[in-house]
Design a protein with these regions (language model features):
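Active-site beta-loop-alpha junctions enriched in small/polar residues
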Residues: 65, 125-126, 150-155
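A short, flexible beta-alpha/helix-coil linker loop
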Residues: 8, 90, 152-155
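Hydrophobic faces of well-ordered beta-strands that scaffold small-molecule active sites
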Residues: 58-62, 120-122, 145-149
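Active-site-proximal beta-alpha core segment in soluble small-molecule metabolic enzymes
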Residues: 132, 146-160
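Alpha-helical scaffold segments that flank or form the walls of functional sites
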Residues: 72-143
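N-terminal metal-binding scaffold of metallo-dependent hydrolase/deaminase domains
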Residues: 1-42, 53
Length: 160
């Protein structure tokens, strides 16, 4: 695969590299190199040209709660337990409904793609079918994830 664009990446801690208007050649799953001019050996191969766009590496999120994405941005005025009781527990209980869960998971996975988060470690809910469906949809979306269920046995309602 060959890409052309403006690439920004960090090859080492504290180091930032910008490559403007260059070609990135990928062979298999590895970067074969960046080039100002495309080497003759790659002539005639298709090039994905991103124009003036900035191309960034994907992000990895190592700790997130997938079911809480539907209530993100609410309740910043509350401490943790009141926030859980007011917003999180009621919405997480709804994941027992597989139709609700599927729609929510699809929105969640679209958000991961939109944010450039292609790998993540996520908690689902205690609902087995919903958790399995999140795993299936994640794979279908072309994302990589470690997905587990929450094991909370204190300060949670009986529904969770």
């Amino acid at each position: 695969m060959i890409f052309k664009g403006n690439f920004l990446y960090t090859p080492a801690l504290g180091e930032l590299t910008v490559r403007e208007g260059e070609y990135l050649v990928v062979e298999g799953e590895k970067c074969a190199g960046f080039y100002r001019a495309l080497p003759q050996e790659y002539a005639g191969q298709p090039v994905t040209d991103f124009g003036r766009a900035l191309v960034l590496p994907a992000f990895c999120d190592l700790h997130l709660h997938a079911p809480q994405m539907v209530n993100r941005g609410v309740g910043y005025d509350q401490e943790l337990l009141p926030w859980l009781e007011t917003y999180t527990f009621p919405v997480e209980a709804r994941y027992g409904d597989t139709d609700f869960a599927e729609a929510a998971w699809k929105r969640f996975l679209n958000r991961m793609w939109a944010n450039g988060t292609l790998r993540f470690s996520a908690f689902a809910t205690i609902h087995k079918e919903a958790a399995w469906r999140l795993m299936e949809l994640t794979e279908q979306a072309g994302l990589s994830a470690l997905i587990g269920k929450v094991n909370m046995d204190r300060n949670a309602p009986d529904s969770l």
